[in-house]
A protein has these predicted regions:
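Glycine-rich, low-complexity intrinsically disordered segments
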Residues: 1-94, 98-132
Length: 132
């Protein structure tokens, strides 16, 4: 897979990031590589997107975690958690476009990805399938 761009955020390391999307993240900018500019046609303010990211700082060897790093919770297989540490650390983030410009920079609300996170894809969010 080839990233199409990167996230630009005030979140500088994993410890700064919310553990879940519903905990809120800061506004961020999706910096898309210029060669993909035509693919942004009709992505406008108000568009809801699913941002697919590669969680590049994740530990791909981890198979079990204490959910939310709470050792009072029993070790749980990563496929039964939302942990970013997993064999294939793909992130899915539902966001709304809040601004655009220059042509390959898109401003979005509440994105819980750290600065420099590679973006793999953008997909329009479907209201009838909230997580698709």
């Amino acid at each position: 897979m080839t990233p199409i761009g990167v996230v630009r955020s005030t979140l500088r390391d994993r410890g700064d990031a919310p553990r879940q999307a519903f905990e809120g993240g800061p506004e961020a900018t999706l910096e898309i590589d210029p060669e993909f500019a035509p693919a942004l046609d009709r992505v406008t303010v108000g568009t809801e997107l699913i941002v697919v990211t590669w969680l590049h700082e994740a530990d791909r060897t981890v198979l079990r975690v204490h959910p939310r790093d709470d050792e009072r919770i029993p070790l749980t297989g990563v496929f039964a958690t939302r942990s970013s540490d997993r064999p294939n650390p793909i992130g899915l983030h539902r966001v709304t476009v809040t601004g655009a410009g220059p042509p390959t920079r898109i401003r979005v609300d509440a994105l819980e990805a750290i600065d420099g996170t590679p973006i793999l894809d953008l997909k329009v969010a479907m209201p009838q399938a909230p997580d698709a």
